[in-house]
């Protein structure tokens, strides 16, 4: 596991880093702004996308009957605790909007040019992110 420390004015973090390592985790130091931007990209926005994806197609009975592991896995975050989901959107909405803009830009970019080349690059980069046990190795 990775634990993000957001020290105030970058106080001495050695004791906390030592404790985190002793507990078997990896400490990462970031400013609150950096932390909020990052979690918007990898947690809050994906939850929002999962909610939107499910909501957009839930009324198509055939699609719901045919839905299997891909749809299940992609929409899992739609079941996030409701209070937590509202807090994410309320307290980190600006960063979620920035992530959404980047996402839409990427969607548009994928439609242009050599799609196979682009998804090959994406697939290769994504495969290098996790080891065989599913642990993020970056």
For each feature predicted by the language model, list its residue ranges.
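Internal alpha-helical scaffold of NAD(P)-dependent oxidoreductase catalytic cores
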Residues: 1-76
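Glutamate identity and glutamate-enriched acidic tracts
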Residues: 17, 22, 34-37, 94-97, ...
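Interdomain hinge/lid region at the active-site interface
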Residues: 62-127
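Long, positively charged, glycine-interspersed low-complexity recognition regions
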Residues: 131-138
